[in-house]
Amino acid sequence: MDFKNEVVDLVSSQVDLPKEKITALIERPKNAKMGDYAFPAFILAKTMHKNPAIIAKDIAENLNSDNFANIQAVGPYVNFAIDHEKLIASTLKDVLAEKEHYGDQKLGEGNVPIDMSSPNIAKPMSMGHLRSTVIGNSIAKTMKKVGYTPIKINYLGDYGTQFGKLIAAYKHWGNEEDVKKDPIMSLFHYYVKFHKEAENNPELDNEGREWFKKLEDGDPEAVELWKWFREVSLKDFKRIYKELGVTFDSYNGEAFFNDKMQPVIDELKDKGLLHESRGAQVVDMGEDENPAIIVKSDGTSIYLTRDLAAAEWRMKEYNFVKMLYVVGNEQAQHFVELKTVLKKMGYDWADEIHHVPFGLITQGGKKLSTRKGNVVFLDQVLRDAVNLAKKQIQEKNPDLADQDQVAHDVGVGAVVFHDLKNDRLDNFDFDLDEVVRFEGDTGPYVQYTNARAQSVLRKAAAMGEKPSEGDFNINDDWAFAVAKDLADFPRIVARSAEKFEPSVIAKFALDLAKKFNKYYANVKILTKDDQIGARLALVQATSIVLTESLRLLGVNAPKEM
């Protein structure tokens, strides 16, 4: 049962405000003794020409509900205290009946392409790619839970001027045998060497531009090298995605749209939107903005041209209701240009394109950079995390079966959870030892809490006890705190989906884990009495919601640790 919705309905029966406005105004009192929800009457003072405290008193006196133990005015607030027994009983009933589908809802429907991950060919995946990959994956899972059909697109960086540079680098320093032996690292070293040498030899940049022009013109040697670079890179990417448990519905990268750009350029011309500026073909963005470049002065296309073609193609292919681009915050202006140009072309669906930006992962406070070579490779971080998790598991539970699988779930899950617990737009520092700790605000802490709940259920089964299916007669403060969180889960899912913000779910999971651990420490769950079934029902419901929270984040939940 949604108690907040009932508060909204009750208040709505007494005041002339839209329900959406009331919902936004409802607060959680900081002092639990003041109740569970509060409605501030300040907003009504101007229109009703009354003291807010009097308004609150009048509202409270006219409200009554069996689901609330107390509804009273406290100063200018109407405070609602939930009937603890009813919240616990209704919440446990819902969670145990719906299981992993608890929190499913219909906020919308239709296709939602999610442009995510999108590493560059011929460069190893770095920690810099982690954010887009795991944020996009979590958003996809959450959007599906609220009714949409997500389509995960890996818009590979498999075209662009960097390939001219890479081909030039390979022609200068490349060795076919080295590339066959260790393809992606060899190509990466050529790329780093190119930029280092180009600092003292600007002619190299010209060579890179010439090779990219050849690639665009279909030169056989350039095309053959490009295909080879793409093939070996994609194979390596898929290995890492498998580690992360991430799959894609499409790997159509920039190159897929190479033959779809000229029709867009022609369309812009036909609609009178394209004109020349300093030798380039541009679209005006307004008086105070620089124009959006569509074709550079040397005749080559740019990233925006392909994104316009990709957006048009995706609309025709998927008929989307929203399209998300999970791309770093530094690309914000690019997406302003993309949406503005599409709107100028007459496409109102551009309003449903959303840039989902995120901050940087730093190490020691410094930004990671591929070009200069001070890069942290993602596969190495995942290996180190798994090894660190395994070491701790062997110390805590040396007899645990399937240690390798559990260590994988905990290590990889720790890296993913650490990323997602941070607000999407925040920059954060990455310290592996902190990330894989079993205590504190970490993924392993949430996983361990779930494993603890599962252990309680196994011990109960060995005693011949099982969770109650209908009699939930518990009413202690520890149980109420847990049940209150469980009751909030559908609202948490909705908020995460609406804001494209996985951290909402990660923070919820941490809070629920902490409250359950307090319950575990203060209540003798396995005492044989007439409430044991109800206590076990709370344990089972907690495990269901923790497991589902972790799943929505793309993290596995081992039953033993």
UniProtKB/Swiss-Prot annotation:
GO terms for biological process: arginyl-tRNA aminoacylation. Coiled coil: none annotated. One of its GO terms (molecular function) is arginine-tRNA ligase activity. Pfam families: Arg_tRNA_synt_N (PF03485), DALR_1 (PF05746), tRNA-synt_1d (PF00750). GO terms for cellular component: cytoplasm. It catalyses: tRNA(Arg) + L-arginine + ATP = L-arginyl-tRNA(Arg) + AMP + diphosphate. The keyword Cell inner membrane does not apply. The keyword Disulfide bond does not apply. A motif ('HIGH' region) lies at residues 119-129. Its EC number is 6.1.1.19. Its main location: cytoplasm. Monomer. Belongs to the class-I aminoacyl-tRNA synthetase family. This is Arginine--tRNA ligase. The lineage of its organism: Bacteria, Bacillati, Bacillota, Bacilli, Lactobacillales. The gene is argS.
